[in-house]
Amino acid sequence: MDTVHSAVGSSKTLLTFFFTREKLFLAFLMNRNTEGSVRLVLDRLEKRFGTFDFLTLFEYILTDRGAEFGDPDSLETGVTGIQRTNIYYCDPMRSGQKGGIEQAHTMLRMILPKRTTFEFLTQWDVNLITSHINSTPRESLNGRTPYDVALEAFGEDVLKAFQLRRIDPDKVILTPKLIRYNPVSYTHLTLPT
């Protein structure tokens, strides 16, 4: 679990997850980069899947020591008051311990380059972005896509609940053109260097 920040001046942030075996990448738009916002995403996912299925999917979560992840007890405790996950922290200055998510962030930044504000994004846009990223074949999966591997591992209902869909690999777009901008707000998407 990690966060990807918007341009300076924007409070919106993406909370991201990476399933290491399947290489499946998820992202959820948050209005602020706070522990409360992270908990809200986890609560919504737990309600969507139910506590047992949430625990099955998110049994262990590895993250960094960002302030938004600073109270593991709060994040580990579910909406029913029972423990829903186990939070573990990377060692300081060891981003390689969660290298898979960093590689997924690199793909995300191909679509949403640094200095891009997320103020214009909707969760629908984020789901489209993650669907394209997860439909990109990976060498580490013997040329298969994370979507297809996750479909076998988790089933179609889980991928639908994550609001992911399969994109034909020939139609995958990993550029800013993927998100169609409103021309009126286009000038507000990036900040000058």
Residue ranges, per PLM feature:
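An active-site-proximal beta-strand-loop segment
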Residues: M1-L26
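Active-site beta-loop-alpha junctions of metal-dependent nucleic acid enzymes
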Residues: S6-S10, A27-F52
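Short, surface-exposed connector motifs at secondary-structure boundaries
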Residues: E22-L26, F52-E59, L112
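Acidic/histidine-rich, metal-coordinating catalytic segments
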Residues: F54-D71, D91-M93
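Charged alpha-helix within mobile-element recombinases
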Residues: T77-G78, R84-L178
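Conserved small/polar residues in nucleotide/adenosyl-binding loops
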Residues: Y186-T193
